[in-house]
């Protein structure tokens, strides 16, 4: 329901003060003053509370932040969220690329348009039932397979589009447990968590 969220978002857009009394079913505010406490409550919301409340998986709940760097920036949050939601396992292959470790089961995002990248949709038996080209900035998916022999990472994007990335194309992917508010524009999620820390 967007009963409370829409009027609140309109007030925010107009620069008006918003009541944070937590009487809304769609919008609530949890006050914490230190980055570590904010991260802990964010993890609890994603893993335990929100999936039950909104009926969505932890992968569908999106963390949004205004910054890339800093204590609550995308880069740090993605590392923490990856460890919490998709920790290392002997059963999951990994590929290190720069400062990022991609792992089977990771939530990832395409970060620039690639009109030549091929995709296909497969039946439950693995047969190709549709194919095309083009993966676009902001598309999100889950890493299905990392194949060191073929040097590829296969990502299952929304609508079941399977895309095989050669290791040479990994600059086009980043972890997507947390994304910037700017990057999320135009996307829809069943729930979002926005961890914020007041500046000096």
Whereabouts are the PLM-identified features?
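Conserved helicase motor core of P-loop NTPases
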Residues: 1, 5-133
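Conserved nucleotide-binding/hydrolysis modules and their immediate coupling elements
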Residues: 79-83, 87-200
């Amino acid at each position: 329901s967007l009963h409370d969220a829409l009027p609140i978002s309109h007030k925010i857009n107009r620069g008006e003060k918003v009541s944070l009394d937590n009487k809304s079913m769609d919008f609530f505010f949890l006050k914490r003053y230190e980055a570590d406490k904010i991260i802990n409550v964010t993890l609890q919301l994603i893993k335990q509370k929100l999936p039950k409340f909104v009926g969505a998986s932890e992968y569908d709940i999106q963390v949004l932040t205004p910054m890339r760097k800093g204590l609550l920036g995308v880069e740090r949050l993605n590392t923490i969220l990856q460890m919490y939601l998709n920790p290392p396992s002997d059963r999951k292959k990994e590929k290190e690329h720069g400062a990022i470790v991609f792992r089977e089961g990771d939530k990832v995002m395409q970060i620039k348009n690639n009109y030549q990248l091929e995709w296909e949709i497969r039946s439950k038996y693995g047969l190709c039932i549709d194919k095309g080209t083009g993966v676009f900035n902001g598309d999100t998916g889950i890493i299905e397979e990392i194949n060191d022999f073929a040097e590829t990472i296969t990502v299952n994007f929304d609508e079941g589009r399977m895309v095989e990335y050669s290791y040479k194309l990994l600059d086009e992917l980043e972890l997507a447990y947390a994304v910037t508010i700017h990057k999320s524009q135009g996307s829809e999620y069943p729930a979002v968590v926005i961890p914020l820390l007041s500046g000096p």
